[in-house]
C-alpha cells in the first residue's frame, strides 16, 4: 500500500511539472522546446562572452599561424571575433574531452564549434517554441514559419557551408570584421553577387524594408484623430480597443492615387501576409543559395562573353567583377595558398622525355 501511494505522489509531481512547463499563464512561456532551448542558448551565450573577452589566438588555417580574436589579445569590438575551429580539425566533432588539454582545445578553436552547435540547437528550439505557444493559444503557425528564414540563414553559414567545404574553419567567424572577411572570401570563391538566389534575397531584404516603411508611414499618416494638438497622437490609442485606430480606406485611396489603384491593398489581412511573406521568401532563397554554393555550384560566369569581330574581348561589368574576385582570392589566406584556386586548377603543360 505504501509503494502505491509513493508512485501516485511521484506521478503527481511529474504531472505538476508538465503542467508548469506547458502553462500559458507563466510570465515567460517555457514549453518542451524551451527545456532544450534554455540550456543550449545559455551555454552558447556564456562561452561566446568568455571567448570574446579572453580566448587565446587560434590556428584557423592549420599552418601554425594563430589569429587573435579576443579583447585581451589586442582586439576591439569591431575587430574582435570568435575564430573558427582550425582546418586541422576539419569537420571532426571536437568537444573539450577530445583534446589532450584545454590549451590545445583553445589553440584549435574548440569554442567556435561549441558555440555554433549549441546556438543552432537553441534557435531551432526557439522556432519550435514559437509554434508550441501558438498551438497552445489556438493561433495559426505562421510566426514560427517566418522565423524559419533567419534560422535557415544561420544554419547555412554556420553548418551547411562548412560541411560542403570540408571544414569548420570555413564557417563564418563570430564577429563584425570576421563577418566582412567571410563575405569577401565568399564572393571571391563563389561569385555570390552573380547568383540569382542571392539577388532574390537582396530583393527580399531591401523590398521588405521599403514595404515596412511604406506601411508604417501610411498608417501613421491616416490615424483617426482622437487627441488635441497639444497631446501626442499615441495617446489616442488604448490597448485592446475594438475600433480601428487608422482609416484604411484613406490610406488605400492615397496610395492608389500615388501609384495606381491596384498597387494598393484593400484587404488588411492580405496586406500583412504580403509584408511577412516577401522578406521571408527572399531570405529562404538566400539560405538556399549559400547551401548550393557550399558544394561549389556557384554564381553565373559571364566572363569574356562579349568579343568583337576580331575575337578581342570587350570587357563587361562581369569581367570587372571577375578581376576583383581574383584579387580578393589571392589576398586571403596568403600563406596557405601559392596560387588562387582558379589559376592552380589549370592543367600543367605536358612535357616529352
Curated annotation (Swiss-Prot):
InterPro entries (alphabetical): D1/D2, Photo_II_D1/D2_sf, Photo_RC_L/M, Photo_RC_L/M_CS, PSII_D1
Key word Nucleotide-binding present: no
Originating species: Arabidopsis thaliana (Mouse-ear cress)
Site label Cleavage, positions: 344-345
A Gene Ontology term for the protein's cellular component: plastid
Positions that bind [CaMn4O5] cluster: 170, 189, 332-333, 342, 344
Cofactor: binding details: The D1/D2 heterodimer binds P680, chlorophylls that are the primary electron donor of PSII, and subsequent electron acceptors. It shares a non-heme iron and each subunit binds pheophytin, quinone, additional chlorophylls, carotenoids and lipids. D1 provides most of the ligands for the Mn4-Ca-O5 cluster of the oxygen-evolving complex (OEC). There is also a Cl(-1) ion associated with D1 and D2, which is required for oxygen evolution. The PSII complex binds additional chlorophylls, carotenoids and specific lipids.
Disulfide topology: none
Record's protein name: Photosystem II protein D1
Binding site for chlorophyll a PD1: 198
Amino acid at each position: 500500500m505504501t509503494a502505491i501511494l509513493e508512485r501516485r505522489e511521484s506521478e503527481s509531481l511529474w504531472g505538476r511539472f508538465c503542467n508548469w512547463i506547458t502553462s500559458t499563464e507563466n510570465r515567460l512561456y517555457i514549453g518542451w522546446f524551451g527545456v532544450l532551448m534554455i540550456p543550449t542558448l545559455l551555454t552558447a551565450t556564456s562561452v561566446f562572452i568568455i571567448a570574446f573577452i579572453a580566448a587565446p589566438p587560434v590556428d584557423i588555417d592549420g599552418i601554425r599561424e594563430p589569429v587573435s580574436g579576443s579583447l585581451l589579445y589586442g582586439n576591439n569590438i569591431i575587430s574582435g571575433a570568435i575564430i573558427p575551429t582550425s582546418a586541422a580539425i576539419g569537420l571532426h566533432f571536437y568537444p573539450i574531452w577530445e583534446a589532450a588539454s584545454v590549451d590545445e582545445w583553445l589553440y584549435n578553436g574548440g569554442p567556435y564549434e561549441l558555440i555554433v552547435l549549441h546556438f543552432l540547437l537553441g534557435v531551432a528550439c526557439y522556432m519550435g517554441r514559437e509554434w508550441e505557444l501558438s498551438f497552445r493559444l489556438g493561433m495559426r503557425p505562421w510566426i514560427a514559419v517566418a522565423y524559419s528564414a533567419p534560422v535557415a540563414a544561420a544554419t547555412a553559414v554556420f553548418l551547411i557551408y562548412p560541411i560542403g567545404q570540408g571544414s569548420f574553419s570555413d564557417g563564418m567567424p563570430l564577429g563584425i570584421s570576421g563577418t566582412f572577411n567571410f563575405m569577401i572570401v565568399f564572393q571571391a570563391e563563389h561569385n555570390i553577387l552573380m547568383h540569382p538566389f542571392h539577388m532574390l534575397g537582396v530583393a527580399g531584404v531591401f523590398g521588405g524594408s521599403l514595404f515596412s516603411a511604406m506601411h508604417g508611414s501610411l498608417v501613421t499618416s491616416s490615424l483617426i484623430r482622437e487627441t488635441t494638438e497639444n497631446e501626442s497622437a499615441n495617446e489616442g490609442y488604448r490597448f485592446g480597443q475594438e475600433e480601428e485606430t487608422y482609416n484604411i480606406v484613406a490610406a488605400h485611396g492615397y496610395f492608389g492615387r500615388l501609384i495606381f489603384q491596384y498597387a494598393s491593398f484593400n484587404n488588411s489581412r492580405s496586406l500583412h501576409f504580403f509584408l511577412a511573406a516577401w522578406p521571408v521568401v527572399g531570405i529562404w532563397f538566400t539560405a538556399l543559395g549559400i547551401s548550393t554554393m557550399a558544394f561549389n555550384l556557384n554564381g553565373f560566369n559571364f566572363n569574356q562573353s562579349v568579343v568583337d569581330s576580331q575575337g578581342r574581348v570587350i570587357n563587361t561589368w562581369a569581367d570587372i567583377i571577375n578581376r576583383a574576385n581574383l584579387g580578393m582570392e589571392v589576398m586571403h589566406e596568403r600563406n596557405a595558398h601559392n596560387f588562387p584556386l582558379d589559376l592552380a586548377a589549370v592543367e600543367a603543360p605536358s612535357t616529352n622525355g
